Amino acid sequence: MNLRPEEISSVIKKQIENYKSELETVSVGTVLDVGDGIAHVYGLDEVMASELLEFPNGVYGMALNLEEDSVGCVLLGDETRVKEGDTVKRTGRVVEVPVGEELLGRIVNSLGQPLDGKGQISVDKYRPVESPAPSVVDRKPVDTPLQTGLKAIDSMIPIGRGQRELIIGDRQTGKTAIAVDTIINQKDQDVICIYVAIGQKASTVAQIAERLKEHGAMDYTVIVSASASEPAPLQYIAPYAGCAIGEYFMYEKNRDVLVVYDDLSKHAVAYRSMSLLLRRPPGREAYPGDVFYLHSRLLERAARLNEDMGGGSLTALPIIETQAGDVSAYIPTNVISITDGQIYLESELFFAGVRPAINVGISVSRVGGAAQTKAMKKVAGTLRLDLSQYRELEAFAQFGSDLDKATQRRLERGERIVEVLKQPQYTPMDMEDQVMIIYTVVNGHLDDIPVDNIERFEDEFLSYIHSNYPEIPETIKKTGDLDDETEEKLTGVIKEFKENFNVKENTLLNVEEGDTGEEENNEGHNKAEQDTEEKDTEEVV
């Protein structure tokens, strides 16, 4: 084989001519130490705050502490896959979540990865979990009601679309129940719902998903779950991820969105543990100094957009758990000051059988009144006052002093109002039905109905009116008002129904009669004892 040097040299020359020097610069760092979900990385001089960092073995982290000679970052995955000396790369982007219609009906984690075993979610759109809140000029006042389907809330603590209403109370007082009922009530209301579970038990989230599925609510709902077993960083970004998913529908689809954060107490605890591990100085109750900003920047993203921005809205229902009813603790006071009102649930009311256990005295909606329908505003105007007076008189009545007739009437009316406002779970009520039954109790039409017949009266009355006079609820629904003609017709129907209503004897009367018999027996027994004592005395004498 003859080798021709000139051919070889020409090939080499060609390759040298075509060679282009391309240097790829990658900003990398080295893991100094790792533990408790936190990694300290040397290098990465140009890293951004909250930037996503890539660790080996498919683990990602988020840069939170930008120190002089190292970067403190939290790991969004299994820390056992990261070891000292590993190389860390910058990604040049912040933490993002997938968004889109494809997420509806799914359960995802804080990074938008599916948890429900229904396969991968194929989306082509992503949004950063942290984004600025709409400015003042982008917003408009809250003017449309968001119906919860709960009589006590829609009548006295109305919520508007774009509002932030806090649900606060001790554990096991029905906070999540109110939020879930509100989601169920958005069926056919054209509202997208996002339920964010932070630090909840996985079994609880599965139960809620099952309930929503039973009532056909998963079709318009996304569940974002960062359960108690997830690392603190994933619990920390969960509410922001849920908000980002909601913002996609608000900004790009001009839809109305409802986001439930359940609950922000556990969110603050997760952030506290991260901050302490990052050696940030602790403040009150060991929370870091920026814990107020943690929640304010999240809840400020709720808004009612003006027409130029598409007219969508994002309503936030944050939940806070109190310890022994203490609303003056650090996190509760922070969130109360950020939100547009609060629904306060009391364990005493809950155990007394008043459910939802709302304490109307300290519950308030600061902007929702403007969004309330005219019909509801008209019938529920005196409801809060009547209920407050009843609670006050009830406290006095416990002393057993003689009450005048006016006070007695108020107490009886109050008992009936409390009974009407009770509502079983998963049974939200339409606005027109709420208006009709509240009108009935406020105007004294139930004053002569025994308290234990009220629930039956309500069910039978509403089915009677829908069967025989469907035009009344239809008019209220269509106009959102209770005009004089409809009111007159409604009063006539109430009287007509009451004539045919079969009042069942109060079962308490039988118990009282039994008690009376017992008292008589006791009197006889006491008299016999007295006679015996007298006889003994005579014998002694």
Swiss-Prot record:
Cysteines engaged in disulfide bonds, as pairs: none
Region of interest: Disordered: 506-541
One family name in Pfam for this protein: ATP-synt_ab
Membrane topology classification: Peripheral membrane protein
Predominant subcellular localization, coarse grouping: membrane
Keywords: ATP synthesis, ATP-binding, Cell inner membrane, Cell membrane, CF(1), Hydrogen ion transport, Ion transport, Membrane, Nucleotide-binding, Translocase, Transport
UniProt cross-references to SUPFAM superfamilies, sorted A to Z: C-terminal domain of alpha and beta subunits of F1 ATP synthase, N-terminal domain of alpha and beta subunits of F1 ATP synthase, P-loop containing nucleoside triphosphate hydrolases
Keyword Transport: yes
Subcellular location(s) of the protein: Cell inner membrane
Coiled-coil features, chain-numbered ranges: none
Site description Required for activity, residues in chain: 363
Chain positions recorded as ATP binding sites: 169-176
EC numbers, comma separated: 7.1.2.2
PROSITE patterns in alphabetical order: ATPASE_ALPHA_BETA (PS00152)
Entry's Gene Ontology cellular component terms: plasma membrane; proton-transporting ATP synthase complex
Entries under InterPro entries matching the protein: ATP_synth_asu-like_sf (IPR023366), ATP_synth_asu_C (IPR000793), ATP_synth_asu_C_sf (IPR038376), ATP_synth_F1_a_nt-bd_dom (IPR033732), ATP_synth_F1_asu (IPR005294), ATPase_a/bsu_AS (IPR020003), ATPase_F1/V1/A1_a/bsu_N (IPR004100), ATPase_F1/V1/A1_a/bsu_N_sf (IPR036121)
GO molecular function, one term: proton-transporting ATP synthase activity, rotational mechanism
Role, per record: Produces ATP from ADP in the presence of a proton gradient across the membrane. The alpha chain is a regulatory subunit.
Subunit structure: F-type ATPases have 2 components, CF(1) - the catalytic core - and CF(0) - the membrane proton channel. CF(1) has five subunits: alpha(3), beta(3), gamma(1), delta(1), epsilon(1). CF(0) has three main subunits: a(1), b(2) and c(9-12). The alpha and beta chains form an alternating ring which encloses part of the gamma chain. CF(1) is attached to CF(0) by a central stalk formed by the gamma and epsilon chains, while a peripheral stalk is formed by the delta and b chains.
Family statement: Belongs to the ATPase alpha/beta chains family.
Protein name: ATP synthase subunit alpha
Native organism: Halothermothrix orenii (strain H 168 / OCM 544 / DSM 9562)
